[in-house]
Swiss-Prot record:
NCBIfam families named in the record: S15_bact
Organism field: Shewanella woodyi (strain ATCC 51908 / MS32)
GO molecular function annotations of the record: rRNA binding; structural constituent of ribosome
SUPFAM superfamilies in UniProt: S15/NS1 RNA-binding domain (SSF47060)
Described purpose of this protein according to its UniProt entry: One of the primary rRNA binding proteins, it binds directly to 16S rRNA where it helps nucleate assembly of the platform of the 30S subunit by binding and bridging several RNA helices of the 16S rRNA. Forms an intersubunit bridge (bridge B4) with the 23S rRNA of the 50S subunit in the ribosome.
InterPro entries: Ribosomal_uS15, Ribosomal_uS15_bac-type, uS15_NS1_RNA-bd_sf
Family the entry assigns: Belongs to the universal ribosomal protein uS15 family.
Lineage: Bacteria, Pseudomonadati, Pseudomonadota, Gammaproteobacteria, Alteromonadales
Gene that this polypeptide is encoded by: rpsO
Name of the protein described by the UniProt record: Small ribosomal subunit protein uS15
Gene Ontology biological process terms in this record: translation
Length: 89
């Protein structure tokens, strides 16, 4: 239920500041968003998978906290990121 290596590499190339950037806030939020979108499709088929649903809620909360941090520290990068990812904020 995780992303494969090609998907991860494409996200790193699109959102990373350099080629080995895996820890910046933008990359972390983009990876979490891709995993959340993947799990949403999983739950359409497996409605009673409560164990994975708990993991999904943890990912959503982590993404929310990272976005709040980015908005508080660098609002311009925050606005660009949510526009690229198509988030509702």
């Amino acid at each position: 239920m995780s992303l494969n290596a090609e998907q991860t590499a494409s996200i790193l190339a699109e959102f990373g500041r350099c080629e080995n950037d895996t820890g910046s806030t933008e990359v972390q939020v983009a990876l979490l968003t891709a995993q959340i979108n993947h799990l949403q499709g999983h739950f359409k088929e497996h409605k009673h998978d409560h164990h994975s649903r708990r993991g999904l809620l943890r990912m959503v909360n982590t993404r929310r906290k990272l976005l709040a941090y980015l908005k508080r520290t660098e609002n311009v990068r925050y606005q660009e990121l949510i526009k690229k990812l198509g988030l509702r904020r």
